[in-house]
Amino acid sequence: MSYAQTKTQSKSGYQAGVKDYRLTYYTPDYTPKDTDLLAAFRMTPQPGVPPEEAGAAVAAESSTGTWTTVWTDLLTDLDRYKGRCYDIEPVPGEDNQYICYVAYPLDLFEEGSVTNVLTSIVGNVFGFKALRALRLEDIRFPVAYIKTFQGPPHGIQVERDKLNKYGRPLLGCTIKPKLGLSAKNYGRAVYECLRGGLDFTKDDENINSAPFQRWRDRFLFVAEAINKAQAETGEIKGHYLNVTAPTCEQMLQRAEYAKELKQPIIMHDYLTAGFTANTTLARWCRDNGILLHIHRAMHAVIDRQKNHGIHFRVLAKALRLSGGDHIHTGTVVGKLEGERGITMGFVDLLRENYIEQDKSRGIYFTQDWASLPGVMAVASGGIHVWHMPALVEIFGDDSVLQFGGGTLGHPWGNAPGATANRVALEAVVQARNEGRNLAREGNDIIREAAKWSPELAVACELWKEIKFEFEAMDTV
C-alpha cells in the first residue's frame, strides 16, 4: 500500500482513510512499564520504507492496528491497548537492518497461554509487505505474566532428587537406527546402554507409532529393559518414551500407559505438536509425578535464518513457560548449529532465575523468572568421548550429555560404548573437582582414564580424528 496519507471526513466526524503507522505507533518518548511484554525484532524494511514507519507497522500489526483507520477505533482506548515501537537501533555491520523494540500492554494476552502470545506477536506481521524480512530476537516476559504459568513440571532440583544423582551431568543416548527396529530389539538396545552406565536412553523425535514398532509394544519392552538394568546396576534409570501423537487424547493415553509401567520420564516434540498440546502434557506430568523431556524438532526451520524467523532463545523461553524438564540446546562442539556465547545465553535463560541483559550473547532484555523452575539443557548431536572435557566445561552439571552415535558406534557394542562415556565423564568431573583446567588439560585427562578402561581406549582410537568444523550461522 502507499504510505501517503489519505483522509475522508465522514458525516459523523470520524476521519476515515489511510495514515502512516508512525503517527500512532512510533513513540520514542515512551518508557516501558514493568508490566509490559517487550519484544526485540530484527527488521529489514523494503526500499523506500523509513525504519520508523516499518517499526511502527510491526507494533501496529502485532497489536491493535490494521492497514486503514476503522470507525471502531472510537469504541476503545487505543492508548491503553496498542503496541508501541519505542526504540530503533541500526544493526552494526548490516545495511538496512534495525533492531526494533516494541512494548505490548499485558492486557493483550490471555493468562498462561504461550499460544496466544505467539499468535499475537508473530502470527500475522511476518508476512507484511512493507518488510523484506523480520526476525523475533528476544522477548521480555513480565513477572506479572510469568506468575500465570506453571512452567516446567518439576525442574532441575526435583529431577535430581527423584533420580538420586548429584554433582555431575547426566548421560544419555538416542537409540539408533531411529526407525526400523522391532520393539524387542529396541528394548535390547536400551538395556545394553543402561547397564553400561548411562542414566537415560531416548526415543528419537520421529519415533511415535509405526507398523514395524507400535508404541504400546515399545513401551513394554523398554520398561522391561529399564527394570533389568536398574536391578543389575543399583541405579535409577529412565528412557524418554515419546508420547507425541496425532491427537491430544492419544498423547495423554500414551502418557497414562507410561505411568502404569512406572516409567520416570516421557518425551514430547513440542514444536511439531504445538504449545497447546505441550502445556496440556506438562500439567499432566506435574500432577502425575513424571519428568518431561522436550525435543525441539523443526526448530531450525524457524530459527536458522539470521534475518527472518524466530530466534531459538524465544522458543526456549516459551518452552520454559509452557513446561518441560529437559530441552535440546545444541552442543557448541558437535554436528549441530550453535555458537558458544549465543548458545550459553539461552541455556542461562532456561536454567537461571535472573539473567541480566547482555547483547553480546543475544540477550536483549533482563529477564526475571520469578522462581519458575529451571529446565535442564540437553547437549546432543555428533559428540563423542573426546568432547567430554569441553562439554562439562561449557554446560556444567545441570545438563544431559547425550551420545547417540558416540555410544552405539563403539566397535564392541552398546554396553562398552556406554561404559566408555561414563568413565570419561567420571574422570573429567573428578579432574575438575581437583582443580584441573579442562580446557587446557582435557585431552590428557581422557588419555589417563583410557589407560585403565579398555572400552574408553577403543573409543578414543575410533573417534580421534572426528571433527565438525563449520562456521556457525547463529551469531550476534
Curated annotation (Swiss-Prot):
Entry GO MF terms: magnesium ion binding; monooxygenase activity; ribulose-bisphosphate carboxylase activity
More info: The basic functional RuBisCO is composed of a large chain homodimer in a 'head-to-tail' conformation. In form I RuBisCO this homodimer is arranged in a barrel-like tetramer with the small subunits forming a tetrameric 'cap' on each end of the 'barrel'.
EC number: 4.1.1.39
Modified residues (N6-carboxylysine): 202
PANTHER family for this protein: RIBULOSE BISPHOSPHATE CARBOXYLASE, RIBULOSE BISPHOSPHATE CARBOXYLASE LARGE CHAIN
CDD domains xrefs: RuBisCO_large_I (cd08212)
Major location category of this protein: other
Cofactor(s) named in the record: Mg(2+)
Top EC class of this enzyme: lyase
Name the UniProt record assigns to this protein: Ribulose bisphosphate carboxylase large chain
Domain of life: Bacteria
Organism, as annotated: Nostoc punctiforme (strain ATCC 29133 / PCC 73102)
Cofactor note: Binds 1 Mg(2+) ion per subunit.
Compartments it resides in: Carboxysome
GO cellular component: carboxysome
InterPro entries: RuBisCO, RuBisCo_large_chain_AS, RuBisCO_lsu_C, RuBisCO_lsu_C_sf, RuBisCO_lsu_fd_N, RuBisCO_lsu_N_sf, RuBisCO_lsuI
Catalytic reactions on record: 2 (2R)-3-phosphoglycerate + 2 H(+) = D-ribulose 1,5-bisphosphate + CO2 + H2O; D-ribulose 1,5-bisphosphate + O2 = 2-phosphoglycolate + (2R)-3-phosphoglycerate + 2 H(+)
Catalytic site: 176, 295
Gene Ontology BP terms: photorespiration; reductive pentose-phosphate cycle
Protein's UniProt keywords contain Nucleus: no
Physiological role: RuBisCO catalyzes two reactions: the carboxylation of D-ribulose 1,5-bisphosphate, the primary event in carbon dioxide fixation, as well as the oxidative fragmentation of the pentose substrate in the photorespiration process. Both reactions occur simultaneously and in competition at the same active site.
Residues that coordinate or bind substrate: 124, 174, 178, 296, 328, 380
Keyword Oxidoreductase: yes
